[in-house]
Amino acid sequence: MSVISIMPLASKPCLNKSFISSTHEPKALRRPISTVGLCRRAKSVTASMSMSSSTAVSDDGVQRRIGNHHSNLWDDNFIQSLSSPYGPSSYGERAERLIGEVKEIFNRISMANGELVSHVDDLLQHLSMVDNVERLGIDRHFQTEIKVSLDYVYSYWSEKGIGPGRDIVCADLNTTALGFRVLRLHGYTVFPDVFEQFKDQMGRIACSANQTERQISSILNLFRASLIAFPWEKVMEEAEIFSTAYLKEALQTIPVSSLSREIQYVLDYRWHSDLPRLETRTYIDILRENATNETLDMKTEKLLELAKVEFNIFNSLQQNELKCVSRWWKESGSPDLTFIRHRQVEFYTLVSGIDMEPKRSTFRINFVKICHFVTILDDMYDTFGTIDELRLFTAAVTRWDKSATECLPEYMKGVYIDLYETVNELAREAHKSQGRDTLNYAREALEDYLGSYLKEAEWISTGYIPTFEEYLENGKVSSAHRIATLQPILMLDVPFPPHVLQEIDFPSKFNDLAGSILRLRGDTRCYQNDRARGEEASCISCYMKDNPGSTEEDALNHINGMIEKQIKELNWELLKPDKNVPISSKKHAFNISRGLHHFYKYRDGYTVANSETRNLVIKTVLEPVPM
């Protein structure tokens, strides 16, 4: 099948890369976002020719900071023209047939005398099936079968690990590492001591000098297992260091192949910054290559066929949802707010990359709406708004009434009204799912968020650089993790009673860690550009202030060490045994955190969305996989 030709909207001409409208008129704002409930004439804020690289004087004489962000990459006309032949009506019957066939495979490897089962490798077969359906993004169809398989494997688990088959006395590294990872992620209690027996007399993981494919696969599974370590697990830290070095060396010696591509992907996108849909697309491509080389077994061929069908059916749904998102964005008047980053397509890519359940369209679309407003507020508080205007807006949000717009400057009125309407609309949606009013949760999160941003705006206006601790405490909130997570997860078809919500929302340890990691990671990617715009305070500058004589490299090393430590703590908060709060409830918030981290892999992938992020949009949303 031919590949879609992707034609992003070309960058618009601009004056010193300032906030220029699509008609090339130097206007920061042509009209407010919304006129709902208001009768007013829009008043534009026009940039004069008096500009520097980071400031501009508007025609009302106000000196404003600017972000110099590139324009929207995805034209609405292009989005509305998307089409796919892979809708459920065309491919749903084929998918159901394949689902039934894969369930039969699960059943046959679970039979004592089944044709696909052998006492020599039955445990590895169960683990491989579970791992494959999860990496291929089709596990939602097989939750019962997965539970049966993992219960079976766990019944043979021992303090010395397991071998590939229940009759194999000696444990092997590959099966033990894969089993450790899969079992821990599903809430089974496993301890890392199982890896001690694989060490040599020098305390290192024992392996031969010959890098066979089997040995490399074993070390790859060890690396994947090491990424879900808890803070106190020294052996897992050692395993990560060893396996990372081993795999990097292997990439230099083995030929380019599906195995080398799998290794490169896993090293590049560690579990905490991986998007499940990108992993699915990558793994499909890897298995397709193996299928071409005729190295796939019958079971995996069937899984691959189902994965391709499911990927493309969801791709059809993605394009329909993206049309709704783009239409909403266009009709809201947001394109006229030319001082903000327009990243609605990128936000949709994030959320559809972490949740591929077809029935959750409402969740995905409303997640984009929340993130869109987070971006508007971010750019307004970070750059465009004056400190007096921002204080007025913060007070208006606390008041939470349409009449609060009376005191706002004209360009803020539309922002406020649309924010007010959207948050209330989302609260009504959440009420349907949760059976109770959740507006107060949303308002509290929003007020805290704007309060943290106002504090940062005050730091900018006075040139104040806080202590590292003061900055990070505020940054956990201004990272927007809480506001981007709270309302969307309440619209899922998952109950979040108060006792569950308090384990993932503020002031829980889970929320604290997620916000901290996002702030720390974001600053390491953004501090140089932020500093060029006049934002001196960052984790890096605050650390250097607290530690006279330290360099930027010292600060980055310290912060990266903090991130690694906090990732392990977040692992524990997600996976720790808790009868009252199931892993499945926390996983939704955790996956949003993974998605947000993904966009800071190389740089600030939201602000600079015309490189890796653009490719991600194409690969996971716009293009189907070849059938």
Swiss-Prot record:
Residue numbers binding Mg(2+) 1: 378, 382
| Alphabetized Pfam families for the sequence | Terpene_synth (PF01397), Terpene_synth_C (PF03936)
A Gene Ontology cellular component where this protein is annotated is: chloroplast
EC no.? 4.2.3.107
Location comes to: Plastid, Chloroplast
Going by the entry's taxonomy, the superkingdom of the source organism is recorded as Eukaryota
* UniProt cofactor(s): Mg(2+); Mn(2+)
Q: Where is the transit peptide?
A: 1-36
- Say yes or no: keyword Zinc present: no
By its UniProt entry, which CDD domains does this protein fall under?
Answer: Terpene_cyclase_plant_C1 (cd00684)
Q: Which UniProt keywords apply?
A: Chloroplast, Lyase, Magnesium, Manganese, Metal-binding, Plastid, Transit peptide
Q: In which pathway does it act?
A: Terpene metabolism; oleoresin biosynthesis
Q: Any idea which positions bind Mg(2+) 3?
A: 530
EC category name: lyase
Cofactor notes: Binds 3 Mg(2+) or Mn(2+) ions per subunit.
Query: From the UniProt record, which GO molecular function terms apply?
Result: lyase activity; magnesium ion binding; terpene synthase activity
Task: List, alphabetically, the SUPFAM superfamilies matched.
Answer: Terpenoid cyclases/Protein prenyltransferases (SSF48239), Terpenoid synthases (SSF48576)
Q: Which PANTHER family match?
A: OS04G0344100 PROTEIN-RELATED
Query: What biological function has been recorded for the protein in this entry?
Result: Terpene synthase (TPS) involved in defensive oleoresin formation in conifers in response to insect attack or other injury.
Query: Would you tell me the protein name for this molecule?
Result: Carene synthase, chloroplastic
Task: Recall the taxonomic lineage recorded for the source organism.
Answer: Eukaryota, Viridiplantae, Streptophyta, Embryophyta, Tracheophyta
Which gene name does the record give? 3CAR
